[in-house]
């Protein structure tokens, strides 16, 4: 949550009900902000996550707590999230990343115990859960867009087999897919998604900031101009109509922006129809050209 004012319910105009946050977002203040807006009374569904930075040095800042998916930390930080959100339960709780310092059997047992206590609904390891009679994962949140399709050949078949919904983030590539940037030499706004002086910026630059991606972007901009479409519109209409995501499986698109104006336009674009064949052809060719350089969907 990077913006907002109490009493504004623009999202509800579009019948949006689900809010996605995480303990790590804006140093925990995202959860705290959401806790102040009476989200339950507004009829909203709340999802949050716990990232295990103990296993990922690059996500450990000076003085920050070391968080794992051990039973102790799961209980401790779920309680912190619940207090920040001013609730006694949430609808979905994600294990935000892999914790290779804690055996999955130990983590899943703890998650199941918390579920039975009524602290969370769905969460997102199927074999371990089935073997032990634990609650099974119900959702996977991952990166997916027209120029990053690494999830298609391996992950989607797995999710479909086990009845797990896919929650997609990064439909606009963190802003890369908006036409805002055009070359490796472009200046970026301090604190933005591609700021090389920030950890998040370095991650996004590793993902998209290279010559093959900029060449693909140039081809997409040309076809966008020809059909009088915006780059963001192309990205959102692709994910809505031409990706492997299906509403009947419970799949969902996560969108975010720096202003309510951007959110409103994104929602409008998501509701538009399929893209022209020529645009799809250019997108497919763009993905083929960058796929050897695309980062893994997992870490």
Can you say where each PLM-predicted feature lies in the sequence?
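Conserved short secondary-structure transition element at the edge of the structured enzyme core
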Residues: 206-271
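Glycine-rich, positively charged active-site loop/lid region within alpha/beta enzyme cores that binds
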Residues: 1-9, 56-63, 160-223, 293-299
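Glycine/proline-rich, positively charged
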Residues: 4, 57-150, 154
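Conserved, mostly hydrophobic/aromatic
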Residues: 19, 34, 46, 81, ...
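Active-site beta-loop-alpha junctions enriched in small/polar residues
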Residues: 22-24, 49-53, 95-98, 122, ...
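N-terminal binding-site loop/beta-alpha segment at the start of enzyme catalytic domains
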Residues: 1-48, 116, 189-190
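Generic structural signal for well-ordered alpha-helices
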Residues: 31, 35, 78-82, 108-112, ...
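Structural preference for beta-strand elements that scaffold enzyme active sites
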Residues: 17-18, 43-49, 89-92, 120-124, ...
